Amino acid sequence: MVPDTLYGIDISDVAIIGILLLGTVTYWFRDSLKARILKPTTKSKLEVFNDNEDSGRDFVKKMEELGKNCIVFYGSQTGTAEGYAKRLAKEGRARFGLDTMVADLDEYDFENLDEVPSSHVVMFVLATAGEGDPTDNAEDFLQYISSDDVNYTLGHNPLLSNLRFATFGLGNRTYQHYNKMAKEVSRILSSQGAHLVGEVGNGDDAGCMEEDFMRWKEPMWEKLTSEMALTERETLLYDPVFNITSDNSKNKDSSDVFVGELNKGYLHGIAKGPFHSTNPYLSPIAHAKELFKGPDRNCIHMEFDIEGTNLKYETGDHIAVWPINPDTEVDAFLDVLGLTAKRHEVISLSSTDPSAKVPIPTPTTYDTIARYYLEICAPVSREFLAMLAPYSPDESTKQEVTRLGKDRNYFSQHVSLRCLNIASALRSVSRGQRWTGIPFSAFVESINRLAPRYYSISSSSLEQPGRVSVTVAVESRSVKSREDKFYGVASNYLLSLERFQNGGKAVAAPSYDIKGPRCMYKGSVVPVHIRHSNFRLPSDTTKPVVMVGPGTGVAPFRGFIRERKKQVEMGLPVGKTLLFFGCRTRAEDFVYEDEWKDVQATMGNKFEVVTAFSREGNEKVYVQHRLQEKAAEIRTLLKEGAHFYVCGDAANMARSVNVALTEIIGAQRGVSMAQAEEIVKQMKLSNQYQVCLSII
């Protein structure tokens, strides 16, 4: 039963509720529209690398021209979904003899989706972004198929009675709208008469996406094999999609050889705006400092100068930072493949399949590919490792790789839990022997493109429109059964840049070639672009806000707080701004403590920081405990229309905060937990309660 009041608002006040709701929806819709207007169309690959231009936006015609009977579309923000789409297409071709192609949803129109022959299959690999939103490149597709007056070319009844499709989603189970994009697309297509092959796959980023993918595709393939009368091949032989040839007429210093440049403009030294996800801006680092540092932990504050560019941001947006791989990992990758001596050899890549686009620039070098273009530090997949078994340096290694490929638990114990990437896995399983027989094209095809890392912007666009700041925890941790530490690629790259900026002691491990291709970066610029979000302060500055952000989860809230401080300085009235911040100890990792004092001096009692130190005192105290202590004040603020925000660890902290808020509502209102959960759900639906989400 739903309670007859929602936070002090009686059902009899429906007229007022309607007006308030209309205002809320209008405001949030305005932000959504603004974000969409500001947000450039996102391609998963930089424009320069699309060597095979499409003849048009008619994918059915393209399939017919190329003789394809299976197309795998992807909706991807960081390249992960694109990677799974490529793997799916590759397996369909090698294992079942399908004629496959991979396609970006943003590159085609879907008016003729009903023209796909019933003898074909369409597959979707779809990531969910934000609070159930489509990725940038899937927005138009979703908008079209979900339109009330959607009108396909042939006008069948049902509309898509000829369409056979399969769907795998990428999401995070800890979020409310888990895999909403994949579920929604499947629901819409099914409601229009399309036939879903198998179940909708749910990849969980909070669990093991790789194993979720493996579990989903086997029954899907089984059903598809039956429906399309496919024959599974007994022996899977690697069939290269890309040819790699040496080019002895050039060397790494040749002007037309890519040595890390992100597009042709940068290669020729004439890069210019507009800057966006396919043309990142080489932003100068305006300021950088370590907020704290210890033997095993660091935290960086870094500011990027975007003054004079077309890049605009709003408080609450994300900035994408394009990293490079560390020297040690580049060396290890080339060494285990026996390519150290050939690292600077110029090679050209070409596609054997007209539908497959070369994912990296060409011509280039082995060193460049490993350093700038591939995710060589990413966890190796069980499927990819198993594919390499025939190229093992000896029989015992082949047997071990085969076992790792077949035994999920064995793979988890010896590879996944040790956080091994492809080079360390190959070196471990072969006891240090080199794998010189693997075609290099296998790595280009199977390892994702090195993707930008997205960080919450921790500055205010009202206060600093020409500067974007980030607050980054540097990832460095010990791993069981592993001698060396595990290092985050991008965060340690930023740490190296910070040390260089301030003339500090260089980072011993990992080290980076921070000068960039042809010394273009000089250790002082970083490729970046802006991604807009709907994580916003309320448009009414008098509305209270409650923010929960332990650790670097405080990043977007620093932007919110600085925005409100600036509003006060401009003479605007502001509501109570309450921050719950948690860390280990006040002395060790209380970031921005002095800054909060400065804010307090300006905002007075309109600003308050409630701290939770987990390693001070006999008992551990976390932000959810402080929420319970402040239950009465939180209830009062919510009755005044406060917006509630959470950013940080989604798997643990955010879930605990959600439970605490639900309990506060239940106890203070005297309603059941089920009723309190319904109230919290409605708060989320109206964007009164927002969670800052990681981008998959």
Report the location of each language-model feature.
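FNR-like FAD-binding dehydrogenase module
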Residues: M1-I696
